[in-house]
């Protein structure tokens, strides 16, 4: 039997540490970011990091060029008079085109150019249903009075479809034999994520320092942000794991009861946490201790001006505290009704045990 009459195996979940913050550390570009998740139970960062990485690289939906037609060209193993690049080079360049489809599963785009000029991706004709991300991508170089007329086939998908398997593309099965004349397949890389790596560091919860911190380093192709990539991967994992989740009624009731108990307090239970759990610098921690600020609920009621008037407390310490409070969805200068509550030490201990 999986359950007895009194105790559910799922009740053990209540004792696990749950992440309290997700931070996004961005580089200068919108395509690269570090996503930081903490605290996690020891070993969980490795499990989650590996699962999220694999899903982001293999299962996210994106858009890619899966084929082209060039006027006057019947196959890729040829060249075009007056064009510097061979058709093979043009095909490889088209494989690097990154685009985004909005409300459409596939699209045919047109490119018409006349030399002398460099033909860039930004010269492709688009509409509201399709946008080009890397508009500076070089497609080819045209000589004097040379014309290039190209049809570009774009579709949504996931993973990678090489030209050796292009006949598996369902869209090609809808094309007539006449339409397939001159069709040149392109290696289709649909994944919007270029690179993902992760590392695990120690995280601190109060006086406990053996918890995990997961840091995901993500680089996308610009069609989505790293935050969106993590969000999509997490949702995919959630959907795949849903069938394994038990319908244990007693566990659900305990979850509802726990949630209702938090609401009965009349304020955010995070306020019952001690400032020792905020992982502040020694200077900031000592300043709060000297001012008899024990709980986060005590701290948030202080204004910035009051904090700056504290001895040895400067702007750097203020910014540090504001950043930590922001991760909890809190700020300085808040008005907390009925604070401090009666038996605050007992409530704080109860809240810690529930976490």
Swiss-Prot record:
UniProt-annotated stretches for the region Alpha N-terminal domain (alpha-NTD): 1-248
SUPFAM superfamilies: C-terminal domain of RNA polymerase alpha subunit, Insert subdomain of RNA polymerase alpha subunit, RBP11-like subunits of RNA polymerase
Annotated signal sequence range: none
Keywords recorded for this protein, A-Z: DNA-directed RNA polymerase, Nucleotidyltransferase, Transcription, Transferase
GO terms of biological process kind: DNA-templated transcription
Function: DNA-dependent RNA polymerase catalyzes the transcription of DNA into RNA using the four ribonucleoside triphosphates as substrates.
Protein name: DNA-directed RNA polymerase subunit alpha
Species of the source: Wolbachia pipientis wMel
């Amino acid at each position: 039997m999986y359950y007895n009459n009194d105790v559910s195996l799922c009740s053990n979940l209540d004792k696990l540490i749950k992440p309290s913050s997700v931070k996004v550390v961005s580089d200068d570009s919108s395509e690269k970011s570090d996503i930081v998740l903490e605290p996690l139970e020891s070993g969980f960062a490795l499990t989650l990091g590996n699962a999220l990485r694999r899903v982001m690289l293999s299962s996210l939906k994106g858009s890619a060029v899966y084929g082209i037609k060039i006027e006057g060209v019947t196959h890729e193993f040829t060249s075009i008079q007056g064009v510097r690049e061979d058709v093979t080079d043009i095909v490889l360049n088209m494989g690097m085109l990154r685009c985004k489809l909005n409300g459409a599963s596939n699209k045919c785009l047109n490119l018409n150019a006349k030399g002398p000029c460099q033909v860039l991706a930004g010269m492709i004709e688009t509409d509201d249903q399709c946008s080009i991300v890397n508009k500076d991508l070089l497609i080819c170089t045209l000589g004097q009075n040379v014309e290039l007329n190209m049809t570009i086939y774009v579709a949504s998908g996931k993973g990678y479809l090489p030209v050796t398997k292009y006949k598996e593309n369902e869209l090609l099965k809808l094309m007539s034999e006449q339409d397939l004349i001159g069709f040149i397949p392109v290696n289709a890389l649909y994944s919007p994520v270029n690179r993902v790596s992760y590392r695990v560091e120690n995280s601190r919860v109060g006086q406990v320092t053996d918890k995990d911190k997961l840091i995901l380093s993500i680089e996308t192709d610009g069609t989505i942000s790293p935050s969106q990539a993590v969000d999509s991967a997490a949702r995919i994992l959630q959907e795949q794991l849903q069938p394994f989740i038990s319908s244990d009624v007693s566990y659900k009731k305990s979850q509802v009861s726990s949630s209702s108990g938090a609401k009965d307090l009349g304020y955010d239970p995070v306020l019952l946490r001690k400032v020792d759990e905020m992982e502040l610098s020694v200077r900031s921690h000592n300043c709060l201790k000297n001012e008899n600020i024990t709980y986060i609920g005590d701290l948030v009621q202080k204004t910035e001006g009051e904090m700056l008037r504290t001895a040895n407390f400067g702007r750097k310490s203020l910014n540090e505290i504001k950043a930590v409070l922001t991760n909890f969805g809190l700020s300085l200068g808040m008005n907390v009704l009925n604070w401090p509550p009666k038996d605050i030490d007992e409530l704080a201990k109860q809240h810690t045990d529930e976490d």
